[in-house]
């Protein structure tokens, strides 16, 4: 009610609240997948509980110091492909209730070169699309009802920050992420700085310098 007084709408569109990037221990994250759906159902209108799916250009293969990092990630990707994804799709369908609470199939891909991206599918039986790069992923997505959008764009380029040289606005990527739990990608001076172990947000990779 207060929002309508401050910013009245000229249309009859409604506001819905959701979370389109929510991790759990299906791959690497915290908490049971069912708990994630239950928590979302209790307070939101829609959700995508998003597994980590791939990292085509994961570095460090020849560095024994990084073996544990590689094993941590690739082990999760393997679990997803050995029954985890099917369980995820089944539970997403279980919680999807038209007119009450909507679920979306999504998954995340990491990339040193292009930056991390998230797929958000319209179809509740969407397959896990394998790719050799983010550009390959976008090419394979053509003709499907799916968005492939950049995530935590403000990190350093070349280390999972977004590669703006590859940005093309269109049906596959109609929007980009401004906020996430990582922080604000708009500016290096804005609130909510990037505090993850991938480093700070250099101004050259934020939205204002795109």
Where would I find each of the regions flagged by the language model?
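Extended, charged catalytic domains and RNA/DNA-binding interfaces, predominantly
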Residues: 1-208
């Amino acid at each position: 009610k207060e929002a309508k007084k401050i910013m009245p709408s000229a249309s009859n569109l409604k506001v819905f609240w959701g979370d389109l990037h929510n991790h759990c221990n299906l791959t690497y994250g915290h908490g049971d997948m069912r708990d994630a759906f239950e928590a979302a159902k209790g307070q939101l209108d829609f959700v995508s509980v998003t597994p980590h799916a791939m990292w085509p250009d994961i570095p460090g293969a020849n560095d024994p110091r990084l073996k544990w990092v590689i094993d941590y990630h690739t082990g999760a990707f393997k679990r997803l492909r050995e029954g985890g994804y099917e369980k995820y799709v089944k539970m997403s369908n279980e919680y999807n209730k038209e007119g009450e609470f909507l679920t979306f199939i999504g998954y995340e891909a990491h990339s040193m070169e292009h930056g991390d991206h998230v797929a958000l599918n319209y179809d509740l039986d969407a397959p896990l699309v394998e790719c050799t790069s983010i550009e390959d992923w976008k090419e394979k997505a053509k003709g499907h009802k799916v968005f492939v959008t950049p995530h935590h764009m403000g990190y350093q380029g070349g280390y999972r920050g977004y590669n703006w040289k590859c940005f093309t606005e269109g049906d596959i990527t109609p929007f980009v992420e401004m906020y996430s739990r990582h922080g604000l990608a708009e500016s290096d001076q804005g609130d909510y700085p990037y505090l993850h172990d991938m480093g700070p947000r250099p101004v050259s990779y934020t939205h204002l310098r795109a």
